[in-house]
């Protein structure tokens, strides 16, 4: 949590660190339930379908960026055939700012992100080398396969903004790959996420 958001974050009740039950969500008497993943609020959800919430008078929202993925067997995030881009984030910011009647703030945030992206592209676009990146998010153990950002994921987008490409070629949004595969890809940069 960013230091400037720590105080606000401390006021938010955590229902679970994984997947909440529908009962635990409804016990909060929500007016609105957003979700990033269809797994949490979709047709095959482990929590509820949007129709279930509508039946009890609760409005809901599912992130449009994740909804754009194609379902892949055994992967809750699916696969993405086209490189993720900021359009998805801008749509979500615009939607939330409209829902919460703060459209001016939403548009200001979008403008700030667009400027920051343009500045990064200008700075890193000068590079003469097409750097290859691997974005490592976690592993079950130090010797286990790596959970990484897939070719067309947001990680692939970040690599493109930095003037390079994702060394992982899988279209799966968040594939698990062997360290041998990573070594064979011979990335110039390995980004280690702190989750």
Where do the language-model regions lie?
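Short hydrophobic/charged patches on amphipathic alpha-helices used for structural packing
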Residues: 22-26, 156, 179-180
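Structural recognition of the beta-strand scaffold that forms the well-ordered cores
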Residues: 32-36, 60-63, 131-137, 157, ...
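Alpha-helical, coiled-coil/dimerization segments enriched in small aliphatic residues
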Residues: 147-174
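Extracytoplasmic substrate-binding proteins
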Residues: 49-142
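A short, structured surface patch at a secondary-structure boundary
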Residues: 1-43, 170
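Acidic/histidine-enriched, beta-strand-rich ligand/metal-binding domains
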Residues: 11, 169-181, 185, 189-195
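A ligand-binding cleft/hinge motif common to bilobed small-molecule-binding domains
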Residues: 40-52, 194-195
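Short, structured coil segments at secondary-structure junctions
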Residues: 8, 55-57, 162-163
């Amino acid at each position: 949590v960013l230091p400037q958001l720590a105080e606000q974050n401390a006021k938010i009740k955590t229902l679970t660190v994984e997947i909440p039950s529908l009962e635990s969500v409804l016990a909060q008497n929500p007016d609105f339930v957003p979700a990033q993943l269809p797994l949490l609020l979709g047709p095959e959800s482990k929590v509820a379908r949007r129709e279930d919430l509508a039946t009890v008078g609760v409005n809901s929202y599912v992130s449009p960026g994740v909804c754009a993925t194609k379902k892949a067997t055994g992967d809750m995030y699916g696969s993405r055939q086209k490189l993720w881009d900021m359009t998805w984030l801008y749509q979500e910011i615009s939607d939330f700012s409209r829902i919460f009647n703060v459209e001016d703030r939403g548009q200001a945030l979008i403008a700030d992100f667009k400027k920051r992206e343009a500045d990064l592209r200008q700075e890193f676009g000068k590079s003469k080398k097409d750097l290859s990146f691997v974005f490592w998010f976690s592993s079950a153990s130090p010797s286990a396969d790596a959970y990484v950002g897939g070719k067309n994921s947001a990680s692939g987008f970040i690599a493109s903004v930095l003037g390079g490409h994702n060394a992982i070629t899988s279209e799966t949004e968040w594939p698990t790959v062997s360290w041998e595969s990573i070594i064979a890809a011979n990335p110039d940069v390995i980004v280690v996420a702190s989750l």
